[in-house]
From Swiss-Prot:
Source domain of life: Bacteria
Family in the record: Belongs to the class-I aminoacyl-tRNA synthetase family. GluQ subfamily.
Protein name listed in UniProt: Glutamyl-Q tRNA(Asp) synthetase
Any one GO molecular function term: zinc ion binding
Organism of origin: Escherichia coli (strain K12)
Record's function text: Catalyzes the tRNA-independent activation of glutamate in presence of ATP and the subsequent transfer of glutamate onto tRNA(Asp). Glutamate is transferred on the 2-amino-5-(4,5-dihydroxy-2-cyclopenten-1-yl) moiety of the queuosine in position 34 of the tRNA(Asp), the wobble position of the QUC anticodon. Does not transfer glutamate to either tRNA(Glu) or tRNA(Gln). The incapacity of the glutamylated tRNA(Asp) to bind elongation factor Tu suggests that it is not involved in ribosomal protein biosynthesis.
Gene name of the encoded protein: gluQ
């Protein structure tokens, strides 16, 4: 049986399509800008489209009004997207259909194991419920791994090897609390939107092999991946909403854009005060070099909570 109709994305051409997909758990900070700017420049330098998706499928983590603020921040920093914003909260039917297809193909199963049990055996799920034929009551849904992906090629970093046990784990695609898992939603939506290359932060390297395994189960073409360096605070922690990284400044966006370009190893206008945001970005697109982007994380105290 072929995947249901909605899962097919008819590609009319071979145009490059990139995306930025923030979760509305708070405002964008400097680390978020790195991911947004890097994906934007890579798409525009390839004469491609740049899409924005709001990943609002985890209501307990969402901050009211954050999604709208994120969109305003992107516009303030000159990062204008193509087409309509895709909201994951409006895509539940697609995720349900994907889950149903996987279940019909015998590629998923219900699991009632608790987090405490999994932690007691070392933190990696052991397939305990694979042959127990549980029903959906008080159960999560796990993928039945067929061909685990243990490595992938990153267009910046080369071949990346995954932890073998993690790669072979039957991971959750629908949570016990009824929420759709990130790995399922992101794969279904990236395919639906025709994304050809995913440019994001290096903190998302780990789930990549799981996402590739889902692409393969569905029989879809796997996109290319680029994982950008992370901005760290002076304590060595990633700038994040959880670590209280300050929101992007609401004033003149140009000095922050210049700092982000320099962070990514790119040529920046020496006399940026003489240029508009649009001109700075046009120059950045023209001079974009992926090979100049550093692979390692960088401490950036200027935009961390240490400077607040």
């Amino acid at each position: 049986m072929l995947p249901p109709y909605f899962l097919f994305k008819e590609m009319t051409d071979t145009q490059y399509i990139g995306r930025f997909a923030p979760s509305p758990s708070g405002e964008l900070h400097f680390g978020s800008l790195i991911a947004a700017l890097g994906s934007y420049l890579q798409a525009r330098a390839r004469q491609g489209r740049w899409l924005v998706r709001i990943e609002d499928i985890d209501p307990p983590r969402e901050v009211p009004g954050a999604a709208e603020t994120i969109l305003r921040q992107l516009e303030h920093y000159g990062l204008h997207w193509d087409g309509d914003v895709l909201w994951q909260s409006q895509r539940h039917d697609a995720y349900r259909e994907a889950l149903a297809w996987l279940h019909e193909q015998g590629l998923s199963y219900y699991c009632t194991c608790t987090r405490a049990r999994i932690q007691s055996i070392g933190g990696i799920y052991d397939g305990h419920c694979r042959v127990l034929h549980h029903g959906p009551d008080n159960a999560a849904v796990r993928i039945r791994q067929q061909h685990p992906v243990t490595q992938f090629t990153d267009q910046l970093r080369g071949i990346i090897h995954a932890d073998e046990k993690l790669a072979r784990e039957d991971f959750i695609i629908h949570r016990r609390d009824g929420l759709f898992a990130y790995n399922l939603a992101v794969v279904v939506d990236d395919h639906f939107q025709g994304v050809t290359e995913i440019v994001r932060g290096a903190d998302l390297i780990e789930p990549t092999v799981r996402q590739i395994s889902l692409y393969q189960l569905f029989g879809w073409k796997v996109p290319d991946y680029i994982h950008l360096p992370l901005a760290l605070n002076p304590q060595g922690a990633k700038l994040s909403k959880q670590n209280h990284a300050p929101a992007l400044p609401k004033g003149d966006p140009r000095p922050v854009l210049i700092a982000a370009l320099q962070f990514l190893g790119q040529q920046a206008e020496a006399h940026w005060q003489d240029f508009s945001v649009e001109q700075i970005l046009q120059s950045a697109v023209k001079n974009w070099r992926l090979t100049a982007v550093p692979e390692s994380a960088i401490v950036n105290s200027t935009f961390s909570n240490a400077s607040c």
